């Protein structure tokens, strides 16, 4: 792997989280409460951007590696809201765990100093269900879903089993790199 030293990265994160007080009995520990904090997610995404930018071997658009300023949106929403987005934009019925809407689409972004990556939407209700199903914490599930959405913002797709396996492995790699 070819690793390089990078200077400071700037991230503008727009974070929104609905009121999920109905789940407060399931979200008791301090670590879990971090998922509702903008500063937590800013640190997570900055860590992932730094990890990616330090290594040019990743399959990402080349112009990403020259940038130092990024922005993205993250919204933690309900099943009802994500089902509505899923129907409108993906033509699929029902809720899903995570949706991402990348803005990066062509090389014209190459000339910009600041890159708007796009938006990630995560259903807290689906994340809770999946954390029970997979027998890990809601914190872990939210990080997993955010990493999946983030990679989609960077142009990753999983149209076949091989691509999906590579993406899931890279998600795990990013998660293990969190400070």
Swiss-Prot record:
Keywords, sorted A to Z: Cytoplasm, Endonuclease, Hydrolase, Metal-binding, Nuclease, Ribosome biogenesis, rRNA processing, Zinc
Main location per the UniProt record: cytoplasm
Localization, UniProt: Cytoplasm
Keyword presence, RNA-binding: no
Residues that coordinate or bind Zn(2+): 148, 152, 158
GO cellular component: cytoplasm
GO molecular function: metalloendopeptidase activity; RNA endonuclease activity; zinc ion binding
EC number, UniProt record: 3.1.-.-
Database matches in PROSITE patterns: UPF0054
Highest taxon above the source species: Bacteria
InterPro entries in the record: MetalPrtase_cat_dom_sf_prd (IPR023091), YbeY (IPR002036), YbeY_CS (IPR020549)
Cofactor, free-text remark: Binds 1 zinc ion.
Required cofactor(s): Zn(2+)
Physiological role: Single strand-specific metallo-endoribonuclease involved in late-stage 70S ribosome quality control and in maturation of the 3' terminus of the 16S rRNA.
Sequence similarity: Belongs to the endoribonuclease YbeY family.
Name this polypeptide is given: Endoribonuclease YbeY
Species, as recorded: Prochlorococcus marinus (strain AS9601)
Gene: ybeY
């Amino acid at each position: 792997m070819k690793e390089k030293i990078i200077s400071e990265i700037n991230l503008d994160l727009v974070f929104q989280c609905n009121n999920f007080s109905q789940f407060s009995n399931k979200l008791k520990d301090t670590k879990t409460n971090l998922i509702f904090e903008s500063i937590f997610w800013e640190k997570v995404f900055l860590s992932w951007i730094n990890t990616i930018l330090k290594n040019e071997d990743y399959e990402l658009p080349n112009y990403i590696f020259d940038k130092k300023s990024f922005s993205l949106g993250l919204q933690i929403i309900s099943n009802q809201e994500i089902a509505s987005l899923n129907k409108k934009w993906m033509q699929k019925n029902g809720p899903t765990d995570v949706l991402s809407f990348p803005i990066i689409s062509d090389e014209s972004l190459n000339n910009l100093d600041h890159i708007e990556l796009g938006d990630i939407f995560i259903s807290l209700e689906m994340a809770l269900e999946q954390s029970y199903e997979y027998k890990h914490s809601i914190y872990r599930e939210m990080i997993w879903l955010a990493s999946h959405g983030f990679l989609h913002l960077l142009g990753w797709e999983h149209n076949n089993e091989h691509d999906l396996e590579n993406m899931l492995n890279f998600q795990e790699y990013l998660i293990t790199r969190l400070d």
